[in-house]
Amino acid sequence: GMAGHAGTMAMSLRQDALTAAAEMVLAIERIGVAGGDRDGLVATVGLLRTWPGVANVVPGDVTFTIDVRAGTNTTRDRTVDVFLAALKEIAERRGVEIEIIPRENLDPSPCDPHLMTLMETAVQDVTGEPARVLVSGAGHDAMIMSRLAPMAMLFIRCEKGISHNPAEAVLPADVGKAVTALTRFVRLFADDYSKTQGRHSA
């Protein structure tokens, strides 16, 4: 955009980088919501900086981050393309320049289907209810471990779904069920492994 004095630059002449960025952030939210949680799609603007960053100057430069995650590369990449088209359209309409710098491009790390089946069975055996399968967009050690061996994860529900926040809370009873389910999973895995080894050696 173009920085200028807040008291002397007419509204009709402004190339306000912050208002352009604000519209872009809202477009990112709108497009993300329209994705309807498809494949665990989420989009976040977690950092926004303005320059010169003073009360009486129209912002001339804004930097912000976009974190886009999904359970598949296809969903993520298609959504990124839609984001980029929207951001470029907003920039052109508002008369500001835009520079997009990709930082990271990490592939999803899907859980092993067979281990997931064993985990679902373990959870159902312990709770009497079907396991809820979800896409976790967070980075876990399992992402690295999946390069070495098949993996699956077990999550404990948090009050109101809050995580990475001091308000995150789990109930002791849920922790107990999770430990029991994990123990059951290990037993199912051991039995399954023994049967598999028996077939290979026969």
Language-model segments: residues:
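Midchain, well-structured core segments that form catalytic/ion-binding scaffolds
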Residues: 1-73
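Flexible, glycine/charged-enriched surface loops at secondary-structure junctions
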Residues: 8, 30-45, 90-101, 127-135, ...
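A short beta-alpha structural unit
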Residues: 44-53, 64-72, 97-116, 143
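Short, conserved charged micro-motifs
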Residues: 73-79
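Short amphipathic alpha-helices in soluble, non-transmembrane regions
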Residues: 79-88
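A carboxyl-terminal module marker
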Residues: 108, 118, 134-136
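Zn-dependent metallopeptidase/amidohydrolase metal-coordination segment
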Residues: 130-181
